[in-house]
UniProtKB/Swiss-Prot annotation:
Its EC number is 2.7.7.2. It comes from Haloterrigena turkmenica (strain ATCC 51198 / DSM 5511 / JCM 9101 / NCIMB 13204 / VKM B-1734 / 4k). Homodimer. Its cofactor is a divalent metal cation. Catalyzes the transfer of the AMP portion of ATP to flavin mononucleotide (FMN) to produce flavin adenine dinucleotide (FAD) coenzyme. It catalyses: FMN + ATP + H(+) = FAD + diphosphate. Belongs to the archaeal FAD synthase family. Keywords: ATP-binding, FAD, Flavoprotein, FMN, Nucleotide-binding, Nucleotidyltransferase, Transferase. Pathway: Cofactor biosynthesis; FAD biosynthesis; FAD from FMN: step 1/1. ATP binds at T10, F11, H15, P16, G17, H18, D93. GO terms for molecular function: ATP binding; FMN adenylyltransferase activity. This is FAD synthase. The lineage of its organism: Archaea, Methanobacteriati, Methanobacteriota, Stenosarchaea group, Halobacteria. One of its GO terms (biological process) is FMN metabolic process.
Amino acid sequence: MTRTVIAQGTFDILHPGHVHYLEEAAAMGDELLVIVARKSNVDHKEKPICPAAQRRDVVAALEAVDDAIVGHEEDIFAPIEAIDPDVIALGHDQHHDDDAIEAELERRGIDCTVERASAREPEREDEILSTRLIIDRILERRG
């Protein structure tokens, strides 16, 4: 039986931290499906710069990812219900409340575990592992 993992996020301006998260998520199962957040659902930080379809295409091109979709406009759990994964892998710094996610999964009858990926430490002094910091650097140098 295939062990399906879902990862999710905004993935605006892909960086090594995103790749680390998705590689760890892929290692949690046999198949990794990624849900890319719609701009309308991003309310915990600045809205993404790149369109959702573009972010999905870039994520889908990664070797660790089997498929990527854009999330539902109104119900962020709708794709999870449709996929019925074995694991939901969260990034180490994602704002989600693990207990609230588990409660909603139980309420909807979705039997899966919620796991957190580890943080990736910079491998070089100048490595940037944050979309916000990449944007800040661009504005600093080109703004």
